[in-house]
């Protein structure tokens, strides 16, 4: 079977890597998606375990669709009576165009007519349409003279997984969406840190894998970090799935995978790690504390004052560490202090090898740390332009040291329009990368 997982732009590489780690075969990265092949179980695994995918689709057919009549005939030829569960409601969404099919609403309507006519002919009953909340959501994709139609196995987007109590607690506040949080955490290897086996020296020194959220905002990064630490399947709590309206759905197989997920979560109770959270903005920290408490994760997260010495004291001895931050909603009046804090943490010997990943705007983080990011990923959290900047501090330290002589890599020149330049003045700490 052919599947694909859709994702926001910028997620593709991380999503492909994630699907490979899940054991899926023939994974291929494309724009806005990653494709894979396998049996029904592989599709289920992607639904249950992917933290980065927006939706997972099973491709039902590919065909010629040069015009409306050819589209109708091709969709009609699909054996819908073996695909759609009797009595299930449907909805069809169309994307893309061909030379003659330029209106996506018309294309979706034509495909719907073909599907319903086929069911009426073979079963004696047309499918009911529920555009808002269907049992089966189908996606028609058109390009040039070709088309494909796929079944959305997810139902609601997979990133809609915040605990209900936390969702209510975060109403009106900036809470980073879980898939964006997972992308940030993937850049610093948080999953690998959580899976790390402690050594005898670690136990003797009380050293633990440590995550420092230096700008915890509304708590989105913290919630996802705890879910990874506890090995909680991101889809385990979902009550409704798009594949339930599919005749190929195997309830016994799905329950088997859920049981496996419960076993993994139980085994993860032996894991030990520290998560330390701070924020320069008192209102943001208050929201994060409320979110963490409402999600039932209070025992996993240690909130402390936004001072580097205090953060390092709470972090204690580390057995591998990472620093993350979401500064996209940090007030401009507090940005200087936020960047100063991250810079001071960067210079701490305890965190010399810790990677830093931060969601930021205008390249502020790299400029504040006087270091080129190892990679910068353009993303759109809250539908606003931002960058996920990743700095490997161990690598940077090696590049900055010659034979006892500091060698700084020059930053790429960045243009700031005169109209916007004043708002950046005073945001960057003086020589925060020195030390």
Show the residue positions of the predicted features.
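Non-catalytic nucleic-acid substrate-recognition regions in nucleic-acid-modifying enzymes
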Residues: 1-136, 199
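Short beta-strand/turn micro-motifs composed of small residues
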Residues: 7, 279, 358-360
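Short, charged/polar, Gly/Pro-enriched secondary-structure boundary elements
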Residues: 41-48, 156-159, 398
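C-terminal edge-of-domain segments
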Residues: 138-152, 386-391, 409
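SAM-dependent Rossmann-like transferase core, predominantly class I methyltransferases
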Residues: 149-189
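Conserved S-adenosyl-L-methionine
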Residues: 176-310
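C-terminal catalytic and target-recognition region of SAM-dependent MTase-like enzymes
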Residues: 307-435
């Amino acid at each position: 079977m052919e599947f694909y997982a859709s994702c926001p732009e910028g997620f593709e590489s991380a999503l492909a890597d994630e699907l490979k780690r899940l054991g899926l075969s023939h994974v291929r990265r494309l724009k806005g998606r990653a494709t894979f092949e396998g049996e029904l179980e592989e599709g289920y695994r992607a639904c249950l375990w992917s933290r980065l995918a927006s939706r997972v689709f099973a491709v039902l057919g590919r065909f010629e669709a040069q015009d409306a009549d050819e589209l109708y005939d091709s969709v009609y030829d699909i054996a819908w009576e073996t695909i759609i569960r009797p009595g299930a409601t449907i909805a069809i969404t169309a994307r893309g165009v061909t030379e003659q099919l330029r209106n996506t609403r018309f294309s979706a309507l034509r495909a719907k007519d073909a599907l319903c006519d086929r069911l009426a002919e073979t079963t004696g009953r047309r499918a009911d349409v529920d555009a808002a909340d269907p049992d089966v959501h189908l996606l028609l994709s058109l390009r040039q003279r070709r088309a494909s139609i796929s079944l959305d196995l997810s139902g609601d987007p997979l990133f809609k997984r915040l605990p209900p109590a936390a969702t209510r607690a975060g109403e009106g506040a900036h809470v980073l969406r879980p898939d964006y949080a997972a992308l940030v955490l993937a850049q610093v290897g948080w999953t690998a840190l959580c899976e790390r086996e402690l050594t005898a020296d670690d136990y003797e020194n009380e050293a633990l894998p440590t995550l420092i959220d230096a700008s915890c905002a509304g708590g989105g990064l913290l919630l996802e970090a705890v879910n990874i630490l506890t090995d909680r399947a991101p889809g385990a709590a979902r009550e409704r799935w798009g594949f339930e309206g599919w005749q190929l759905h195997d309830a016994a197989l799905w329950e088997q995978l859920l049981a496996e997920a419960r076993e993994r979560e139980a085994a993860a109770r032996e894991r030990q790690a520290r998560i330390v959270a701070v924020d320069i903005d008192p209102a943001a920290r208050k929201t994060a504390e409320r979110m963490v408490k409402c999600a039932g994760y209070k025992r996993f997260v240690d909130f402390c004052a936004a001072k580097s010495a205090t953060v390092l004291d709470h972090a204690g001895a580390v057995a591998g560490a990472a620093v993350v931050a979401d500064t996209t909603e940090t007030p401009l009046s507090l940005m200087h202090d936020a960047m100063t804090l991250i810079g001071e943490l960067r210079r701490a010997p305890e965190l010399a090898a810790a990677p830093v990943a931060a969601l930021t705007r205008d390249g502020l983080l790299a400029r504040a740390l006087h270091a080129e990011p190892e990679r910068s990923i353009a993303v759109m959290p809250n539908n606003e332009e931002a960058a996920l900047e990743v700095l490997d501090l161990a690598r940077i330290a090696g590049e900055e040291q010659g034979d006892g002589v500091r060698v700084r890599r020059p930053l790429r020149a960045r243009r700031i329009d005169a109209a916007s330049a004043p708002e950046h003045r005073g945001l960057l700490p003086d020589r925060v990368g020195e030390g």
